[in-house]
Amino acid sequence: MKKLVLPCLMGAALFSNMAMAESQKAQKPFTMGVVVKVGGIPWFNVMEQGITEEGKKLGVNAFQVGPTTADPAEQVRAIEDLIAKKVDVIGVVPNDAKVLEPVLKRAQEAGIKVITHESPDQKNADWDFELLDTQSMGANHMKDMAACMGEEGKYAMFVGSLTVPLVNEWADAAIAYQKAHYPKMQMVDDRFGVAESVDDSMRTANDLLSKHKDLKGIMSFGSQGPIGAGRAIDKRRKNAETCVFGTFTPGQGIKLLEKGAIDGGYISNPKVAGQVFVQVATAMMNGEEIKTGVSIGDMGEIKVSGNTILSDNPVNLNVENTKKLVEVGL
């Protein structure tokens, strides 16, 4: 039987008007295109709001491009199109960091600045930015799921893709924390790269629940994973027996969360990520120095490691916080 996880207000600052450094407007107008993993899903729809709204605020012609499938080849084609259009800045949320290296190099050779998100140390990018600390992200998810599982039993791990660095780093951190602190817990099989698809996640969860009758938990780093897993668990009426934690879009997950088919998780706010794309691009185009200790817009004070801009702005997806995010359109 599940153990209840105490609600945590960590990250509630996302709902308040915290005093962040006011981003400077673009000194000269420029054009920016942001290529996301896949278009038409809630997470990236909300990110698009942040991109377009911040663009208008800072005087930047900023827009989002969403491939029809989460296929790296489609991202390559979208980036090639932006190069042909001679945009000033290209932003990317990569599906496969390695596959994008050649086309990002071509962009830089054409004089285009390149910014990525969720791809730390991305080769051929000027900057990558992160809104969540990797070790904390993994540890927080595992602490909560371990509490739910009674610190013992079998669990499975979903990620958005086996080739996206960040979600796999989160998974690595969670698994390492489990091995160090919860020896009676055991991960079944290897991680599954299904969490960008509700259908694939639901099918995989069903397969796992059939194969492992005593499965007690599913963790997912990828916004569609908890939804698919939660639906599978709800349909099997295992809400009270199986714990699901991970990154999900509040509007998609709130009903499953209230029913106990999803139990919680942590996310960054994709609207903030969209805003930060434009804020970092504007700082670069204005010639501002990006270094540890400075503040950049909604990131607040940053740390820099190589070409990665680091911050930590999580929100806990308990019922209370998730409802608030739904109210603001996420």
Predicted regions and their residues:
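Positively charged n-region of N-terminal signal peptides that target proteins for export
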Residues: 1-4
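Intrinsically disordered and other compositionally biased segments
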Residues: 6-7, 21
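Bacterial N-terminal signal peptides
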Residues: 7-16
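A residue-level marker of the well-folded mature domains of exported/periplasmic proteins
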Residues: 13, 21-330
